[in-house]
Amino acid sequence: MTTNAGPLHPYWPQHLRLDNFVPNDRPTWHILAGLFSVTGVLVVTTWLLSGRAAVVPLGTWRRLSLCWFAVCGFIHLVIEGWFVLYYEDLLGDQAFLSQLWKEYAKGDSRYILGDNFTVCMETITACLWGPLSLWVVIAFLRQHPLRFILQLVVSVGQIYGDVLYFLTEHRDGFQHGELGHPLYFWFYFVFMNALWLVLPGVLVLDAVKHLTHAQSTLDAKATKAKSKKN
């Protein structure tokens, strides 16, 4: 990107020259309402499904965790998958998801600059954590023995990617957004991404707890069987 004396876009650094930029024709509230409406419908649908389709009854916490993984599957596969496919065309495209990314990029312009780390990180997220998030939901509904391992793998992967996401921007001096802006910095950049540190962190502890208990039970049975032989 080259510099431009008079920026005609809302992105940072303000000297960026974005010749192909086309402003969104949808207001911010419209974009956010669309995103959160779809997310809300998905949460309600997953909640109802987890109460009816599970092989064994699931508790409130487990059903809420499945709602989280369903939302993750949607965001990783659809929204981030869109970015992976069309990141080179976002600036001039007016499809809803392109406008969503142009709106989010006001808090992190790496998404409209084709930043190498961002593209690679989002590709891994869309291709791995998206499908695996949906597999977590199915695994818990079916009581699959891999369910807590899948939960652990996905959650650790999400935390790892999110930590790198924050640290790379920190090392760049937070130059890709307006530092301290209540919406673009604190809500888009900090809060929305911090969710993928806090919730996966809780789910990692949950998975470790159950896997540790299962291993302890197996070890106890093995010890008991060995003592009987002796």
UniProtKB/Swiss-Prot annotation:
Resulting phenotype, residue 47 to C: In MEND; patients have increased concentrations of plasma 8(9)-cholestenol, 8-dehydrocholesterol and 7-dehydrocholesterol; probable hypomorphic mutation
Q: What is the effect of changing residue 193 to A?
A: Reduces catalytic activity to less than 10% of wild-type
The record places domain EXPERA at: 61-204
Q: What is the effect of changing residue 188 to A?
A: Reduces catalytic activity to less than 35% of wild-type
| Listed transmembrane segments | 29-49, 66-86, 121-141, 185-205
Location of this chain's protein in the cell? Endoplasmic reticulum membrane; Nucleus envelope; Cytoplasmic vesicle
Consequence when changing residue 125 to A: Reduces catalytic activity to less than 10% of wild-type
* UniProt GO BP: cholesterol biosynthetic process; cholesterol biosynthetic process via desmosterol; cholesterol biosynthetic process via lathosterol; cholesterol metabolic process; hemopoiesis; ossification involved in bone maturation
Superkingdom field: Eukaryota
Q: Which PROSITE patterns match?
A: EXPERA
Query: GO molecular function terms here?
Result: C-8 sterol isomerase activity; cholestenol delta-isomerase activity; cholesterol-5,6-oxide hydrolase activity; identical protein binding; steroid Delta-isomerase activity
Q: Mind telling me which Pfam families this protein's record contains? A: EBP
Keywords (A to Z) from UniProt: Acetylation, Cataract, Cholesterol biosynthesis, Cholesterol metabolism, Cytoplasmic vesicle, Disease variant, Dwarfism, Endoplasmic reticulum, Hydrolase, Ichthyosis, Isomerase, Lipid biosynthesis, Lipid metabolism, Membrane, Nucleus, Steroid biosynthesis, Steroid metabolism, Sterol biosynthesis, Sterol metabolism, Transmembrane, Transmembrane helix
| One Gene Ontology cellular component | cytoplasmic vesicle
E.C. number = 5.3.3.5, 3.3.2.11
Q: What family classification does the UniProt entry report for this protein? A: Belongs to the EBP family.
Recorded disease: Chondrodysplasia punctata 2, X-linked dominant: A clinically and genetically heterogeneous disorder characterized by punctiform calcification of the bones. The key clinical features of CDPX2 are chondrodysplasia punctata, linear ichthyosis, cataracts and short stature. CDPX2 is a rare disorder of defective cholesterol biosynthesis, biochemically characterized by an increased amount of 8-dehydrocholesterol and cholest-8(9)-en-3-beta-ol in the plasma and tissues. MEND syndrome: An X-linked recessive disorder associated with a defect in sterol biosynthesis. Disease manifestations and severity are highly variable. Clinical features include intellectual disability, short stature, scoliosis, digital abnormalities, cataracts, and dermatologic abnormalities.
Q: Which PANTHER family match?
A: 3-BETA-HYDROXYSTEROID-DELTA(8),DELTA(7)-ISOMERASE (PTHR14207:SF0), STEROL ISOMERASE (PTHR14207)
What name appears for this protein in its UniProt entry? 3-beta-hydroxysteroid-Delta(8),Delta(7)-isomerase
Top-level taxonomy: Eukaryota, Metazoa, Chordata, Craniata, Vertebrata
Report the gene name. Answer: EBP
